[in-house]
């Protein structure tokens, strides 16, 4: 895994015939942790680099009264009737999503739509999503953040909505915390959203103070090696460590 070149695009052939073209497409990269890593939730300074590997999401309004999320990587389609979609309780929505096949991965996409509709008072409409990702799953390179940022970017283009400053990564974090149920910090979403090719992104995680990107000297490269250890922010141990860090402030 190396630093990020141009982001990919992919065809929309897997979107259903009922979609109202044109749709919106957006991409976001994974990130390589160069310094700081898991200490983001304790307010530390971290250095992150965007990867070449990215996630691309295409979204389009459709006529069928449902949300549909197709993953080109697993070859599955998640569907949720609009009548079962509610934003008054993220926890209730999480249970509804997980009760359906594919809900474990589709929750990131549906969660982004939920927070955007709720926080920005947008009209809920039937949408079909198509997702393709090159970011390795469970390897600690922020595959979930890349999916969230790409989804929110696509939705903002679809709804013709502009989110200033760090609002987009904050909404992405809210989707992962509230709908997915993972107690992640904000670092991954910031890195995926604001990372610059061939640069390190310094972030002071208190919670989202961005410093100017640092260009890499010529000839210097960072390479990520797969340790074979699977990583999951949703794991119980992560939540326990984060809770312990907060207790240290009191």
Regions of interest found by a model, annotated:
Residues 183-187, 191-250:
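Acidic-enriched catalytic cores of C-N bond-cleaving enzymes acting on peptides and small amides
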Residues 2-145, 149, 153-166, 170-180, ...:
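ATP-binding N-lobe of GHMP and related small-molecule kinases
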């Amino acid at each position: 895994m190396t630093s990020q070149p141009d982001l990919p695009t992919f065809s929309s052939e897997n979107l259903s015939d009922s979609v109202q073209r044109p749709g919106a497409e957006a991409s976001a990269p994974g990130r390589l942790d160069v310094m700081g890593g898991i200490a983001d939730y304790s307010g530390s300074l971290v250095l992150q680099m965007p990867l070449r590997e990215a996630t691309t999401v295409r979204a389009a309004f459709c006529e069928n009264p449902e949300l549909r999320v197709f993953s080109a990587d697993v070859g599955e389609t998640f569907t949720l009737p609009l009548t079962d979609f509610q934003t008054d309780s993220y926890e209730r929505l999480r249970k509804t999503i997980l009760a359906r096949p594919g809900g474990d991965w589709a929750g990131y996409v549906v969660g982004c739509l939920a927070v955007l509709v709720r926080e920005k008072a947008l009209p809920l409409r039937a949408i079909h999503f198509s997702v393709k990702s090159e970011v390795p799953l469970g390897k600690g390179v922020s595959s979930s953040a890349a999916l969230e940022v790409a989804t929110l970017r696509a939705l903002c283009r679809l709804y013709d909505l502009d989110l200033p400053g760090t609002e987009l990564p904050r909404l992405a974090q809210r989707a992962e915390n509230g709908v997915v149920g993972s107690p992640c910090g904000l670092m991954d979403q910031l890195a995926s959203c604001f990372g610059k090719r061939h640069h390190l992104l310094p972030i002071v995680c208190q919670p989202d103070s961005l410093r100017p990107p640092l260009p890499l000297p010529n000839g210097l490269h960072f390479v990520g090696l797969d340790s074979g250890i699977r990583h999951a922010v949703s794991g119980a141990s992560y939540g326990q460590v984060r809770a312990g860090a907060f207790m240290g402030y009191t």
